[in-house]
């Protein structure tokens, strides 16, 4: 019964983006957040160390892990087919191998989005709208210009944008510049960082 916010990623298939926005309206979501701080895949060091991949690759190490964990292995082989509800109508319906969904997401996430894309989503939504990934005063001002009602200062936990400044370091200058014109939220998630 509480407020609901939908975190949106722009897709190359604009019909899918439109469909998600319309479904959120019909489902009673109160606000929308467009994520712009994850245009590159995260540096998942643990996955590199363990050899994790999607779909799983059969290596000597993974075969040993499957053999040592028979319950997990059987669950993987005989579980309900994986579905990503938001896009199930656009992928191979319930493929046992997660590759169809992963390939779709890799092909469909828009890495070249621009301010026109963001403004389109703000207008299409027509309600409270946050832009997540703002890291400069200039971008905060532009978010106001396109109609956002909130910004989220974020670098996606440092995993995607590890070389950027920390959101906390951006907070005071952004709040000083636009804090009286737009709601400013600081993303508190920090997974890692080198700076």
What positions do the PLM features span?
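Alpha-helix-loop-beta-strand connector modules within alpha/beta enzyme cores
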Residues: 2-5, 27, 60-61, 111-129, ...
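Short acidic, glycine/serine/threonine-rich loops at helix termini
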Residues: 17-20, 43-49
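Catalytic cores of alpha/beta
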Residues: 18-21, 135-147, 176-180, 184-186, ...
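Conserved, mostly hydrophobic/aromatic
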Residues: 34, 121, 143, 151, ...
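Terminal interaction modules at protein C-ends
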Residues: 48-114
